[in-house]
Design a protein with these regions (language model features):
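Cleavable N-terminal export/targeting peptides
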Residues: 1-11
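Outer-membrane beta-barrel architecture
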Residues: 51-55, 118-120, 190, 232-234
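Repeated loop/turn-to-beta-strand initiation elements of outer-membrane beta-barrel proteins
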Residues: 62-66, 128-131, 197-203
Length: 237
């Protein structure tokens, strides 16, 4: 039966758990480029994650192990910034596109969903505390990187090109969603605390190491990386 199966797995060094949590963070260039003069507002939005994973302890004392699993997660944020000579491609009212250097305000909405495979090394400090670190690979399922520009002007093609003003109650949209990479990867590190016999509290930091945009996308002139802290609860079988 199910109980005997779990006991037998534990005797052979296997552990299983399911996790549910939320992520706080953002997608950002590191460091902030000179074009971004100030961050006026930031909203992490509600980003949920669900995960099933398994740990294989690889020596008799169960100090060291390997963890892998599958995680369904979202990475979100909303920001508003003031920029100068920021590369931009806006969508005009007639559906056409204007490309150039934007000076003014930029609002950004990031809302992406991923299927993620972590591969981590685990170290058991004691019966309650576990540390984990390793790498992850993510495949994007749903993608959005869009927003508006307002209270400023666009210099077409280059910083000295024709000036297109967007001021007052006017704004223009941009949408780079189709330019997001399908595959992303990075590093992950975190800790678990066993609060009760089967219930854990965990915190994991993930840091992307490749640009979220495709290699041939040049409108945004700097790389952007997803950096998120995931906090939640786990049930250990």
């Amino acid at each position: 039966n199910r109980t005997k199966t779990l006991i037998n797995a534990a005797l052979h060094g296997w552990e299983y758990e399911v996790r549910a949590g939320f992520s706080i963070g953002g997608t950002s260039p590191i460091p902030l480029p000179a074009e971004i003069r100030s961050i006026n507002s930031y909203n992490p939005s509600l980003a949920i994650s669900l995960e099933g994973n398994m740990t294989k302890w690889i020596e008799p004392t169960k100090k060291w192990g390997i963890v892998t699993g599958i995680r369904l997660e979202s990475r979100k944020m909303k920001t508003d910034a003031t920029v100068k000579n920021y590369n931009m491609e806006i969508i005009a009212s007639d559906g056409g596109r204007l490309k150039g250097n934007w000076t003014g305000k930029v609002s950004t909405n990031v809302n992406n969903s991923y299927l993620t495979l972590p591969v981590l090394a685990a170290y058991k400090i004691n019966d309650r505390w576990h540390m984990k670190a390793g790498v992850y690979a993510s495949y994007i399922l749903e993608r959005e990187f869009s927003g508006n520009v307002y209270d400023g002007y666009l210099r077409e093609e280059n910083p000295t090109g024709d000036k297109v003003s967007i001021e007052g109650d006017k704004s223009a949209k941009y949408d780079f969603s189709e330019e997001l990479r399908h595959f992303q990867w990075g590093v992950q590190a975190g800790a678990d605390w066993l609060a009760f016999k089967h219930l854990k509290v965990y915190a994991d930091l993930t840091w992307g190491l490749n640009d979220i945009f495709k290699k041939d996308f040049t409108t945004i002139s700097f790389a952007m990386y997803p950096i998120y802290l995931n906090i939640g609860f786990a049930y250990a079988f």
